[in-house]
Amino acid sequence: MSNPRPHHLNLAGEKVAETAAFYQNMLDLAPIELPRIREGYAADIFTLEDAQGYQYHIIPDDPGFAERNNLPINPVGGGHLAFRVDDIAAIRAKLDALGVSYSDMGVWSIKGWHQLFCTDPEGRIIEFHQVVDEG
């Protein structure tokens, strides 16, 4: 079973630092560092976390990223909701069975996270990721 559970909300926009400061102050969030892979995604991001471990990723909006990288789904344009799962292959199989297009990014932006992006019927971007051992 893949056991999807909410993990983070990704907010993309132009005023990244200002937006991060707003959410940090408004929701009493703590800044955290993620182990980044700059070759996969080099933009500066702000990552905040609440007391329960739910994260907020504030990133620059990049609507052309998917086209430049030949992807059907843009993982960094417009923001997304993310679910952590135990079995990314089960999610991939379910999306295939439902005929849903997706971008399987593998481990590309955050070390140890295999990320896959799809859209819901309204076009909202959804991320599923599994923590994997890279060792």
Regions from the language model: what does each represent?
Residues 10-55:
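Core segments of cupin and vicinal oxygen chelate
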Residues 14-17, 74-125:
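Vicinal oxygen chelate
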Residues 32-34, 42, 64-69, 104:
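A short, acidic/glycine-rich surface segment
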Residues 33, 128-135:
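Short beta->alpha transition motifs characteristic of CBS
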Residues 46-52, 118-121, 131:
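Active-site beta-strand termini and strand-to-loop segments that position acidic
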Residues 51-55, 62-65, 88-89:
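Short, charged/polar surface micro-motifs in flexible loops or helix N-caps
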Residues 56-59, 117, 127-129:
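Conserved beta-strand in the GNAT
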